[in-house]
Regions:
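Extracellular/periplasmic catalytic domains that process cell-envelope and extracellular macromolecules
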Residues: 49-50, 78-79, 109, 128-133, ...
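Short, charged, amphipathic alpha-helices and their helix-cap/turn boundaries
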Residues: 38, 65, 116, 155-179, ...
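Sec-dependent signal peptide recognition
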Residues: 1-7
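C-terminal motif of bacterial Sec signal peptides marking the signal peptidase cleavage site
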Residues: 13-14
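Active-site SXXK
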Residues: 39-42, 56, 62, 85-114, ...
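Short, conserved catalytic-motif segment at the N-terminal edge
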Residues: 29-87, 120-123, 169-174
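Acidic/histidine-rich, surface-exposed loop or edge segments in extracytoplasmic proteins
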Residues: 19-26
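Active-site helix/loop module of the DD-peptidase/beta-lactamase fold
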Residues: 86-90, 104-146, 150, 173, ...
């Protein structure tokens, strides 16, 4: 029903009695009607997906041209454009770029075993015929590692993401799912380990490395 109402609203707004100006300069930054549609759609999408709140922005080559916040950040406060969110798996993009930068600089190789770079790595591997768990096998989600670290951080809001030390301590209680480089298995644990590789090899914290080598050069 909500999708039908949303579609109807778009049709009504699109069919308003307007003359089309064939001389319109598409370089003009007059996006007010588009922004109105975006705001309406985001508000409806928030309700349809039962989201408590969200923020959104649009930017072009000259900077931000539109932003807005919708819903609540908690029971008493409305969302605002300054609210921050965990980017979760988007961090895999930055991790992969950082790893490939270190490869290009000759500091690591794609076929380096993870044990070479993280001496504390000690997961139980019953597959004696398994190939080494390499940087490449982790990047391609074919390492044989479990999907998650041994923590319930997806279970309830009060469970935060595990610290590096917690990941290290729990590795010995986890097992490989299959021999490395044999099957595909999405692994958040694997990409977390590559984040630790970035720290070990560069000497910087993950946040500092990403900021200095990716975000700042891109003026982000």
């Amino acid at each position: 029903m909500k999708k039908l109402l949303l579609l109807s609203a778009f049709v009504i707004l699109s069919c308003q009695d307007k003359k089309i100006d064939s001389t319109f300069d598409f370089d003009q930054k007059n996006y007010s009607e588009a922004f109105q549609l975006i705001e309406f759609w985001l508000e409806a999408q928030k309700d349809y997906d039962n989201l408590p709140g969200l923020t959104a922005m649009i930017a072009d080559q000259d900077g931000m041209v539109w932003s807005d916040a919708f819903g609540m950040q908690n029971e008493n406060e409305e969302m605002n454009i300054e609210n921050t969110f965990s980017i979760c798996s988007i961090s895999k993009l930055f991790t992969s770029i950082a790893i490939m930068r270190l490869v290009e600089e000759g500091k690591i190789k794609l076929d380096d075993p993870i044990e070479k770079l993280l001496p504390w790595f000690n997961i139980d591997n019953e597959f004696k015929e398994s190939k080494p768990i390499t940087i490449q096998s982790i990047l391609t989600h074919s390492s044989g590692l479990p999907r998650e670290s041994n923590h319930p951080y997806w279970s309830y809001p009060e469970f935060s993401f595990p610290s590096k030390q917690e990941v290290i301590e729990e590795l010995k209680n986890q097992q490989m799912l299959y021999p490395s480089s044999k099957y595909y298995q999405y692994s958040n644990l694997g990409l977390s380990l590559l984040g630790y590789v970035v720290e070990e090899v560069s000497g910087d914290s993950f946040d500092d490395y990403i900021t200095k080598n990716i975000l700042e050069p891109l003026l982000m």
